[in-house]
């Protein structure tokens, strides 16, 4: 997993819980989940109480078509249930925003870290991936800024808004769609 933000954590935990034997999160910065800590003014707006995926996709600037599938497979209710199953209760505010019951973002960080630890996910901070190559056999070779080398059968890029993930994907031959901000409104 390249990226130690919430998407990287959710993907790593899910992979480990579904039986992937060795899951490693490589995070470029000294600490994982840093943006979660500051989101929502330190409270972390986890999701929004919008139960119909078709309604939810209408709130995103790219429109509904690209998001219909993902939001139908893992909707707001699924997110709420996931956190509840992992020990974090979310509460709805009058405007539909959902925050941790503790009303502090650190509760979300602690929940994700606990779930990762329980699932056997390993975390390596300060590991900015510089090169990602795919061999003819389909295995990946990964190296970071310290020349540490990793091999993997699968790689998931979850670098958030940082351009490094797009560059790595492009280096592998993927076509990149220019990103746009996508906050719920």
Write out the residue ranges for each language-model feature.
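Cofactor-binding loop segments of dinucleotide-utilizing enzymes, especially the Rossmann-like FAD-
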Residues: 4, 28, 181
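Mobile, glycine/GP-rich and aromatic-enriched active-site lid/loop segments adjacent to catalytic centers
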Residues: 85-111, 118
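N-terminal Rossmann-like FAD-binding beta1-loop-alpha1 element of flavoenzymes
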Residues: 1-25
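Glycine-rich active-site loop/strand segments that organize a redox cofactor
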Residues: 43-92
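Predominantly flavin-linked oxidoreductase catalytic cores and closely associated redox partners
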Residues: 18, 106-185
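Residue-level detector of alpha-helix initiation sites
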Residues: 1, 5-7, 31, 156, ...
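Glycine-rich FAD pyrophosphate-binding loop
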Residues: 16-41
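Short, structured coil segments at secondary-structure junctions
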Residues: 39-40, 86, 172
